[in-house]
Amino acid sequence: MFLAQEIIRKKRNAEALSKEEIQFFVKGITDNTVSEGQIAALGMAVYFNDMNMDERIALTTSMRDSGTVLDWQSLDLNGPIIDKHSTGGVGDVISLMLGPMAAACGGYVPMISGRGLGHTGGTLDKFDAIPGYQTEPDSALFRKVVKEAGVAIIGQTGDLVPADKRFYSIRDNTATVESISLITASILSKKLAAGLDALAMDVKVGSGAFMPTYEASEELARSITAVANGAGTKTTALLTDMNQVLASCAGNAVEVKEAIDFLTGRYRNPRLYEVTMGLCAEMLMLGGIASTETQAREKLNAVLDNGKAAEIFGRMISGLGGPTDFVENPGLYLPESKIIRPVYAEQTGFATSMDTRELGLAVVTLGGGRRKPGDALDYSVGLTQVCALGDEISKDKPIAMIHAQTETAFAEAERAVRKAIHIGDSRPEKTPEIYRYIRASDL
C-alpha cells in the first residue's frame, strides 16, 4: 500500500518512482482516490525533476491500461494493426490520405483522432464537415468499419484512457503541459490503447509546430520512440517540417476537398505527398507489409494510381454514415463560405518565410478553429491556394484565397495572412520535408 503524498515527496526530491508506485498513483487518478491537488503536485514535481525511461514507460502503460484497451484478435484480421499520430500543425491533412493508403496495402488502421485547439487543426473537425459522418460511433460499428474498409477514423470514446483525461485537464490548469515525460505518456497512452502493432509518429518542427525548437522536437521524438518500443509497440518517429502550411490549404471542408483531390490524382501538393509517403512507408515496414522503403513506396503509389485508396476512403465515409458518392461528388456535400476572394501581397519578390502559427490562428479568426474547447466551428471557412516558400510573388498573383462568411472576418484574415507571409528579394534555400527518422535502432 502506498501513500500518494509519499510518491509526490519522492519525485519532489528527484528520486525515481517504481513501476508499482506509478501504477498506484494512476489508479488513484482514475478512481478519484487521489485529489486534484495531489495530481497537480506530482505534475509539477515531474515537470521540474523529469522521469527516466523506465518511469515514462510505466506511466504510459499504466495510463493506457486505465480504461479499455482495444483487442482486434476476435476479428481475424489478415494484416497488422498500424497507425500514425501527429503532434499537429496547419494544413496537416495527412491522416485522410494515409489511413486509406495503408489499408489499401493490407494494413488495418483504427485511428483515434482529436479535435483542433489553438492554431492547429483537428482531424475530427475535418470529418465533421462531411454530412452524416459519425466521429463517435459505438464500438460495434467502429470494429465493423475497420474490418470491412480497413480503416476508421473516429474520436476518443469515454472508456479509453480515463486517467489521461483527468491528468491532462489538471496539467492544463497548472502550467505543466510542457513536460516531455508527460507529453509522451499522454500521446502514447491514447494511441497504444487502440491495440496497435506499429506506429509512425509525426513530430512537427518549425513555426507552426507544437514544440518551440528543433531540439525540443527531437527530444520528444526520441522519448516517444523509446517509450513506445519499450511498451511493446514498434514505433518510428519522423521529424517533419512545419515552417509553412503543409497542404495548399488550411481549414476543414477545404482540407477534405484537398484530400480527395490527392487520393483521386487530381492534384497532389508535392510537400504533402513527401510527408504522407514517408510516414505511410514507415507504417508498412514496421507492420511487415514491406521490407524496404522502395518496396513500400511502390505499393503506395500503386494504390493511389489504381484508385484503390480513394475507393477505401469512400467506403469508410459511407460505412460511418456519410454519403455513398462522397468521393465522386464532394461539392454536393461540403459547405462553402459566402465570400471566396484572393489576398495579394503588398510587395513583390519571393515568399521567404511564414509564421505558420499565425496562419493557423487566421483560420480560427474566420471561425474554423477553437479558442477554447467546446467552441462551435464553421466548417466552410479557411485558406486555399496558399503560396509555398520560394514562390515568386507578384502584384497580380494571390498569396492565398480566403474563404470567409463576412466582410469583417475577411478583412481581419487578410491582415493576418499578409503579416504572416514574409516577402523578400531573394529566393530562400529549400528546406527538407522530412528532417530525419528516429528508429528504435537509433536510440
Curated annotation (Swiss-Prot):
SUPFAM superfamilies: Nucleoside phosphorylase/phosphoribosyltransferase catalytic domain (SSF52418), Nucleoside phosphorylase/phosphoribosyltransferase N-terminal domain (SSF47648), Pyrimidine nucleoside phosphorylase C-terminal domain (SSF54680). PANTHER family: THYMIDINE PHOSPHORYLASE. One of its GO terms (molecular function) is 1,4-alpha-oligoglucan phosphorylase activity. The lineage of its organism: Bacteria, Pseudomonadati, Pseudomonadota, Gammaproteobacteria, Alteromonadales. Homodimer. GO terms for cellular component: cytosol. This is Thymidine phosphorylase. It catalyses: thymidine + phosphate = 2-deoxy-alpha-D-ribose 1-phosphate + thymine. Its EC number is 2.4.2.4. Pathway: Pyrimidine metabolism; dTMP biosynthesis via salvage pathway; dTMP from thymine: step 1/2. It comes from Shewanella woodyi (strain ATCC 51908 / MS32). HAMAP family: Thymid_phosp (MF_01628). It is an enzyme of class 2 (transferase).
